[in-house]
Amino acid sequence: MAYQVTTFYHFTRLNCLAEKQSRWQELGDRLGLKGTILLAEEGVNATIAGESAAIEEMVKIMAADLGLTSVPQRHSWAKTIPFQRMKVKIKPEIVSLGQPQVNPEKQVGTYVSPQQWNQLLQDPDVVVIDTRNDYEVAIGTFQGAVNPCTKKFRQFPDYVKNNLDQQKNKKVAMFCTGGIRCEKASAYLLEEGFAEVYHLRGGILHYLETIAPEESLWQGECFVFDERVAVQEGLKVGSHALCDHCGYPLRVGDLAEIRYAVRHCPQCGLTVAVSNEL
């Protein structure tokens, strides 16, 4: 049996957070769903997994609680549910940039479809930036994209000030896993006075789901924050596992007959047993 994995986010001003937390936690548990839902005054960010009908009911009720008829979602599949339990958490931000003046509900950059994205990547006048963390970029990114070498998203404003402040009149295009980080980053750049800011609608996941492999400018795999670790074209489960010691993503390789292989983590140097049961 395959389980559905659904991700979505929405920037909107929310109140009664504790009430929504309690209601959604109870609902997710009752429907047998697992995953993580982050709630903040700026909106909601969710990844949930389970049976399709249960997810459909959960999302429908959540959308109604948010005053929406529907929310844009990304769907993929996994052989097992890639979460241990359902967690609904209240946070200061649904994605932590540390810039309280930034309001994606007020302004964001220009959305670019996966079909249009390849044109931007091949435009020499466009600065293409991967807004994800360094360990995510290490296993896959777009051709020609700049890696800011950040350890966490909160470091992105410092990268902008140190590297992009003199390029405010240039076209800047950004991307991330599912769209939420580059959407907030685009709002930040506009707030800082950048003239033309673009971001990939639906993020890498939408691109991998939409663009045929022979047309794709993606290289490698896309890190995801669940037990699948990474996905590839068509959102199929990738070939990475996490280091038991430091959490760095390791490539498993083609181990057709061997269930476990000993590897040395290139990040921390410790020996780790990597499971090939993806």
UniProtKB/Swiss-Prot annotation:
GO terms for biological process: tRNA modification. It catalyses: uridine(34) in tRNA + AH2 + O2 = 5-hydroxyuridine(34) in tRNA + A + H2O. CDD domains: RHOD_YceA. GO terms for molecular function: oxidoreductase activity, acting on paired donors, with incorporation or reduction of molecular oxygen. InterPro entries: Rhodanese-like_dom, Rhodanese-like_dom_sf, TrhO, TRHO_N. The active site is at residue 176. Keywords: Oxidoreductase, tRNA processing. Its EC number is 1.14.-.-. It comes from the Bacteria. Residues 122-216 form the Rhodanese domain. Catalyzes oxygen-dependent 5-hydroxyuridine (ho5U) modification at position 34 in tRNAs. PANTHER family: RHODANESE-LIKE DOMAIN-CONTAINING PROTEIN 7-RELATED, THIOSULFATE SULFURTRANSFERASE/RHODANESE-LIKE DOMAIN-CONTAINING PROTEIN 2. HAMAP family: TrhO. Belongs to the TrhO family. This is tRNA uridine(34) hydroxylase.
